[in-house]
């Protein structure tokens, strides 16, 4: 971001099993552990390098019911979402909004988008976004049905799992929304 580094290794990991409570009938089974790593370089290192077109981040901790939305207590209750409905509403609002912002800023439209990868909180959010954007389900990549919500790793992991199938020229949007109401998006040109 400051122009000093030419190479970086970006890591993300979440050990959600430290938080979840299997006896919780509403959420105990929804979480998964995962990690992902990406090597980013200013110079090309292979013929199949993808380009990060743009990145956008935003903190929305002041919005809605953010301060009370999610509680992480490893040894005392696990992950609790007393304001889960508000998290759902804000995620369904800001994930597509962030992608549309980046597309427009960089001279693209939804028609240019090859794949959409959203934070893997639940499939209801992805279905809601697909309807809002009028995008076919085939453009949405996901792994939540096999891994659960892997937290901050979820979108990066979906990208990594599908990297082999991206073709030269594909435009991939990745967008996230966390329980702390941190949100963002990234456009990648393959």
Task: Label every PLM stretch briefly.
Residues 1-4, 114-190:
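Claisen-condensing/thiolase-fold acyl-transfer catalytic domains that form or cleave C-C bonds
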Residues 3-34:
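Flexible, glycine-rich active-site loops centered on histidine and acidic residues
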């Amino acid at each position: 971001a400051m122009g000093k580094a030419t190479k970086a290794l970006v890591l993300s990991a979440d050990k959600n099993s430290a938080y979840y409570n299997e006896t919780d009938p509403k959420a105990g089974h929804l979480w998964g552990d995962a990690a992902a790593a990406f090597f980013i370089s200013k110079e090309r290192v292979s013929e199949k390098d993808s380009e990060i077109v743009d990145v956008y981040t935003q903190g929305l901790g002041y919005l809605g019911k953010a301060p009370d939305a999610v509680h992480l207590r490893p040894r005392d209750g696990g992950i609790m979402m007393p304001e889960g409905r508000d998290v759902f509403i804000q995620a369904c609002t800001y994930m597509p909004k962030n992608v549309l912002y980046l597309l427009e800023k960089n001279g693209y439209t939804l028609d240019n988008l090859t794949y959409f990868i959203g934070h893997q909180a639940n499939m209801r959010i992805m279905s809601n976004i697909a309807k809002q954007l009028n995008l076919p389900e085939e453009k949405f990549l996901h792994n939540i049905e096999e891994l659960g919500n892997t937290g901050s790793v979820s979108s990066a992991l979906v990208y990594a799992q599908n990297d082999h199938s991206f073709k030269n020229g594909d435009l991939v949007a990745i967008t996230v929304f966390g329980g702390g109401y941190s949100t963002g998006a990234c456009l990648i040109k393959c």
